């Protein structure tokens, strides 16, 4: 119980691996790993790459992206 309280007090932010999304729930389409890595790391992720032929086509996938950054969720992209 004490360790849980300490964890909450330290303000540790959780992370996840996911497609980074624009505010309208659209992915960032890509052609190179370099562009995605920059986008992901600029948003606090450990790294990123261009996922070729994935669920949303060629889109940026981020590794250890902070929870505060929007990710692609089920549903439509609202452009």
Swiss-Prot record:
Disulfide bonds join 26-77, 30-50, 36-60, 40-62. One of its GO terms (cellular component) is extracellular region. It comes from the Eukaryota. Residues 1-14 form the signal peptide. Residues 16-78 form the LCN-type CS-alpha/beta domain. Keywords: Disulfide bond, Ion channel impairing toxin, Neurotoxin, Secreted, Signal, Toxin, Voltage-gated sodium channel impairing toxin. Its main location: secreted. The keyword Transcription does not apply. Pfam families: Toxin_3. Transmembrane segments: none annotated. GO terms for biological process: defense response. It is found in: Secreted. Belongs to the long (4 C-C) scorpion toxin superfamily. Sodium channel inhibitor family. Alpha subfamily. This is Neurotoxin BmK-M9. It comes from Olivierus martensii. The lineage of its organism: Eukaryota, Metazoa, Ecdysozoa, Arthropoda, Chelicerata.
């Amino acid at each position: 119980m004490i360790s849980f309280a300490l964890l909450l007090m330290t303000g540790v932010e959780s992370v996840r691996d996911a497609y980074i999304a624009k505010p309208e729930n659209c992915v960032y389409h890509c052609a190179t790993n370099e562009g995605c890595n920059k986008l992901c790391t600029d948003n606090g992720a450990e790294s990123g790459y261009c996922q070729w032929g994935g669920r949303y086509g060629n889109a940026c996938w981020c590794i250890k992206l902070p929870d505060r950054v929007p990710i692609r969720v089920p549903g439509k992209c609202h452009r």
